[in-house]
Regions:
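Formylglycine-dependent sulfatase
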Residues: 1-360
Length: 362
């Protein structure tokens, strides 16, 4: 298959075969809200003060977070990608109910259609609801949020834990193998959903005139990947397929998530605004990047500041808060695998490689 975890792929191989597979696509952060905030405005989250995870909202899950969260807004004149498409006459929608941006925003000003709450997945799109409200011939810009590694029990058990590779920075124990196998199971389910999206577009006669960007906003949920800027947290698969995209290509040059917005606008013939820091990587005159940048800042109540710079040959990481351990208090603490890691560290059962991340000091 196009990627080693999707052999026999239903959807992902279709996109890879009909378009471009990008092997060195990097997200601007290793966590959902910072990456999504960056991608939706086409600029680094650190450039606009929208880098702290889940800021810019007055309440979260029914809890009042205070006025400091509510006051984070985009600078004057900076619009989101769906707002720019909507202003250009496009129908806009967001399937999956996730508009996880670190600034105060009104989804109703961004999207013409927000499906009824159904959780992550393409249910409304597969039913044709996402674009049925358009005027005849009206183009659309849509976002579809898939659960990926967060699908939980919705992903059937297919992968044998005994056969998965375990990175050296994790202890090779049954709990870790089960977690990794479940992640691959989720990817197979995601592949199935990508196939459903393609089928729905073809059914409604839209596929041949739709430019599709398929990518992840961050890496694997387990420790050292999600929220961090190692390769497992920020180097993601991405495919682009559609009109004007030559089939069967593989590109190995560096692409950043901030490049997606200008590429989308350029494809639609919409002017790219000056605040965008990315570049149209599909343009004929595109100059390949010399580097990409990623940032880790506050996630939930964990204070952190790490920066990464990746070139074609090297990677530079800088930890600013060296007085803090990597494993600060986290929402992952109640997980059985987290408790097992803590127990192993306390008993001296982790090796030197594993203690680099799980130890008491950076």
């Amino acid at each position: 298959g196009a990627f080693r975890y999707c052999r026999g792929s239903i959807g992902i191989d279709q996109l890879a075969a009909s378009g471009i597979r990008f092997d060195r696509f990097y997200t601007p952060a290793g966590v959902c809200s910072a990456t999504r905030s960056s991608i939706i405005v086409g600029a680094m989250q650190t450039s606009l003060g929208i880098h702290n995870h889940r800021s810019g909202r007055a309440n979260f899950r029914g809890k009042d977070l205070g006025p400091v969260y509510d006051d984070i807004r985009l600078p004057e004149g900076v619009q989101t990608l769906p707002e720019m498409f909507r202003a250009a006459g496009y129908w806009t929608f967001n399937e999956g109910g996730k508009d996880d941006y670190n600034f105060k925003h009104d989804p109703r000003a961004m999207y013409d259609f927000l499906p009824r709450k159904r959780g992550w997945g393409p249910a409304a799109l597969v039913a044709g609801e996402c674009w049925e409200g358009r005027k005849k011939g009206q183009p659309f810009f849509g976002q579809v949020q898939l659960g990926g590694g967060k699908l939980g029990r919705r992903a059937p058990k297919v992968i044998d834990p005994a056969g998965v590779p375990v990175p050296p920075y994790y202890p090779d124990i049954p709990l870790v193998r089960e977690e990794i196998a479940h992640h691959y199971d989720c990817l197979l389910k995601t592949d199935e959903q990508v196939g459903q999206i393609i089928a729905a577009l073809k059914r409604d006669g839209l596929y041949d005139n739709t430019l599709i960007f398929c990518f992840s906003d961050h890496g694997y949920k387990l420790h050292r990947h999600k929220q961090f800027v190692y390769e497992g947290g920020i180097q993601m698969p991405m495919m682009v397929a559609g009109p004007g995209v030559a089939a069967g290509q593989v590109r190995k040059d560096l692409i950043s998530g901030i490049d997606i917005a200008p590429a989308c606008l350029s494809a639609a013939g919409i002017d790219v605004p000056g605040h965008m820091e990315g570049a149209d990587f599909l343009a004929e005159d595109y100059t390949k990047r010399k580097f990409v940048v990623a940032a880790r800042d506050r996630c939930d109540y964990t204070i952190e500041r790490i920066r990464a710079l990746v070139t074609p040959r090297f990677k530079y990481l800088r930890n600013y808060l060296t007085d803090r351990p990597f494993m600060q208090p986290s929402y992952k603490d109640p997980w059985p695998v987290s408790k097992k890691f803590g127990d192993m560290m306390a008993k001296g059962e982790m090796n030197e490689t594993q203690l680099i991340f799980f130890g008491p000091k950076k």
